[in-house]
Curated annotation (Swiss-Prot):
This is Isoprenyl transferase 2. Belongs to the UPP synthase family. The keyword Metal-binding applies. Coiled coil: none annotated. SUPFAM superfamilies: Undecaprenyl diphosphate synthase. One of its GO terms (biological process) is polyprenol biosynthetic process. It comes from the Bacteria. Keywords: Magnesium, Metal-binding, Transferase. It is an enzyme of class 2 (transferase). GO terms for molecular function: ditrans,polycis-polyprenyl diphosphate synthase [(2E,6E)-farnesyl diphosphate specific] activity; magnesium ion binding. It comes from Tropheryma whipplei (strain Twist). Mg(2+) binds at residues 39, 226.
Length: 258
């Protein structure tokens, strides 16, 4: 009985604190585009003494879905999840990569049922199963079965910021005559040819696990982004952590490089 009572009190305190944080947020200054770097899944699996690293990836994916719901509750327009980098594809062992691919495929299926989904990244080196899942997302998005107000979710899979910029420049070089290139290679043209062309840059980038770096994530688009680094590992992310990040953003005065 004592344990149940303690849990009930803890849950009540948590709910009260969450409402308090929500009340402190300036709802007139919310980010239009939030990005989440999901990090710490493997460390979480080791910390929890799980037999399989994939348990950490699956727990992190579940928390990413929670994160999307939290963003949707605040009417945030665009959310980007950094799920799989080019470096992950190159450096993870085969078994872990296979498990991770299955987790991401399940995540894609779940997310695409509720929100508009874009793939941000290259399909070139993706495992066939993952490539097919992303192709399925393209087809479902084309059916226009989502409302105009539906949140857009970008899934950064097979993503590298350096590769993205390189590919954008190549597109431009292959599109225009050599003599026109000096005038055509502008910030606006490069932005339009990125994987995220046509979408706004992230206003707020959140990273879990205590690491304070971007890890090749949107180096071009994050020029004027605000950053919020959390100590919590990906699977341990809580709604109050999210609300603190949003509260912090909502009271900042952004300089945009001025």
């Amino acid at each position: 009985m004592g344990g149940k009572m303690l849990r009930s009190v803890s849950e009540l305190i948590y709910k009260v604190y969450a409402r308090y944080l929500l009340g402190q947020i300036n709802l007139n200054n919310l980010p239009g585009h939030v990005a989440l770097i999901v990090d710490g899944n493997r460390r979480w699996a080791r910390k929890e003494k799980r037999d399989r690293i994939s348990d950490g990836h699956r727990a992190g994916a579940g928390k990413a879905v929670d994160f999307l719901h939290w963003c949707d509750e605040l009417d945030i327009n665009i959310v980007t999840l950094y799920l799989l980098s080019n470096d992950n594809l190159k450096n993870r062992n085969r078994q872990e990569l296979n498990d991770l691919v299955q987790v991401i495929c399940d995540l894609i299926a779940q997310v695409s049922k509720r929100w508009k989904v874009n793939h941000v990244g290259s399909c070139e080196n993706l495992p066939e199963l993952l490539g097919n899942s992303l192709e399925g997302v393209k087809s479902s998005t084309k059916t226009n079965r989502y409302s105009e107000r539906s949140m857009t979710v970008n899934l950064a899979i097979g993503y590298s910021g350096r590769a993205e910029i390189t590919e954008a420049v190549r597109k431009i070089v292959n599109t225009y005559p050599i003599g026109d290139l000096p005038e055509k290679i502008t910030e606006e043209v490069i932005s339009a040819n990125l994987y995220t062309g046509g979408l706004s840059d992230p206003d707020l980038i959140i990273r879990t696990s205590g690491e304070q770096r971007l890890s090749d994530f949107m180096p071009w688009q994050s020029t004027h982004s605000e950053f919020y680094f959390l100590e919590a590992l990906g699977p341990d992310l809580r709604k109050v952590d999210f609300l603190r990040a949003i509260r912090d953003f909502s009271i900042r005065r952004r300089s945009f490089g001025a």
